[in-house]
Structures are given as C-alpha cells and as structure tokens.
C-alpha cells in the first residue's frame, strides 16, 4: 500500500465520518527517515486524519519526536506489529517471556516520553497490557490484548465470526 492510496481513503472516510477520530497508519517504508515520515504524515493530515500511527519503538522514537515537534499527533503501536510479522515468525503473541515483557514496558515508557499521544497494544498478554495501561500516561487501545486497556479495537470479521481461512482469535 502506498502513501497516496492511504491519503485517498483517509479523505473518503473524512467526508463520511466527520466526528470520529481518524488515524492513518504509516505504511511499511514510509517511516524510514523522519523526513519521509513527515511528508507522508502531512499528506494524511491534509486528507483529514487527526493523528498518524507508526509501529515500533527503538529508532522510531526519533521519528515520533520529529513529528510531534512539528505539531503532528502520533499514535504508537507496540506488541504484535503487523509490518514486522515476518521477523516475529508469524502472528504470535508478544511479551510472554519476561525479557520481552520488560522490553515492552521500556518501549511503552519511551514512546510516551517521545510524545506519542495514544498507544495501541496488539497481541500482548492481558495481564501485561493491563499493567502497561496502569503505568501509561497516555491512553491505550488493545487489539487482542485483554480488557484492561483503555479502549478496544474489534475487527468486524472477528466480531461476526467470519472465518477468513486463518486461525480464529481466542478473544
């Protein structure tokens, strides 16, 4: 998916959903540098997004700071980050082992400290997600991360029990 494709769809959603918070996801590769991320984010904001989402921490902290310093609200995404699924060896819950949980705790503190205004936790054990939420100065949204987050993403196909050929989620 290209930046232009997302900007087009953000504009369509913005026309139909005027009061909803619209968050546009930076596609794979669009956040390779702070400048590239900024260029994409500006397009999304101009199209009607209120915030941009990017996956991960580490080197992404510089990008979060860069965007926030330029008045672009950022949503960070930790845990099972779909753009990194090949590195994870598939769609697997993240943070089960103590070392991985400690890294998620550090990453959650770091993205909030860098200026992210919202944190998505995906595929994280429920107890860890609840602990991250309790310690977080910013709201958390869970995707398959238990009921302890501040809000939830529910995928329509999961909610309706529509099988797309993949293993059904346990939540």
Residue ranges of each PLM-predicted region?
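Alpha/beta enzyme core
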Residues: 1-171
């Amino acid at each position: 998916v290209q930046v232009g494709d997302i900007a087009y769809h953000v504009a369509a959603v913005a026309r139909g959903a005027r009061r909803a918070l619209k968050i546009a996801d930076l596609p794979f590769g669009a956040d390779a540098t702070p400048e590239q991320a900024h260029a994409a984010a500006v397009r999304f904001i101009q199209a009607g997004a209120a915030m941009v989402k990017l996956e991960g921490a580490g080197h992404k902290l510089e990008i979060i700071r860069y965007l926030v310093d330029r008045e672009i609200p950022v949503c960070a995404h930790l845990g099972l980050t779909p753009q990194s699924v090949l590195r994870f060896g598939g769609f697997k819950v993240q943070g089960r082992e103590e070392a991985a949980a400690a890294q998620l705790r550090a990453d959650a503190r770091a993205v909030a400290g860098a200026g992210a205004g919202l944190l998505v936790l995906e595929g994280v054990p429920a107890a860890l997600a609840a602990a991250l939420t309790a310690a977080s100065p910013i709201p958390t949204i869970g995707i398959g991360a238990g009921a302890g987050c501040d809000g939830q993403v529910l995928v329509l196909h999961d909610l309706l029990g529509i099988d797309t050929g993949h293993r059904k989620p346990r939540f």
